């Protein structure tokens, strides 16, 4: 929308209603002697609360999608604050329920007006499904949940392993790129290699839970 340069809109006494599904009832905030650190912490908690809706959204001022990379970090912060495990589970199930025919997990999901997986696929974002599942089990052990979602996690690992040669070296796929950072002015192969090692260790622990020896 646009207006005439000779006219402008003016709002008098505007009000804003904020929404969150974050539960403050059991939340005990941390206290720091350093006032700057305290302010950073308080703003961080408020931002997490603003992103805590039907899912962990990608920021209240952004596109409000559910991104797997963001979910991993938001879930970790959630365990140290509001500790709403049901919301983490909901997000994991959303991703698990909307894989491609090949079994790939989308990097993000639109949740309004209906749940729709995006057609963006990123190397480490699919792997972070494993990380988020592992972190949840570390915070709140749930073998039944692991058994139910393990096949999806294993599928992500198997798909990704096809990108490595017999010497364990990553062969990048432009259709399944390593993200790491918005900049494309540097080689991301080493970062992808490190991410795979990081997630592989977590996957092995999940495999032990379900007693998968393969």
PLM features per residue range, with description:
Residues 55-56, 166-169, 206-213:
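Surface-exposed helix-capping loop/turn segments at secondary-structure junctions
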Residues 7-161:
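Substrate-binding groove/exosite segments of carbohydrate-active enzymes
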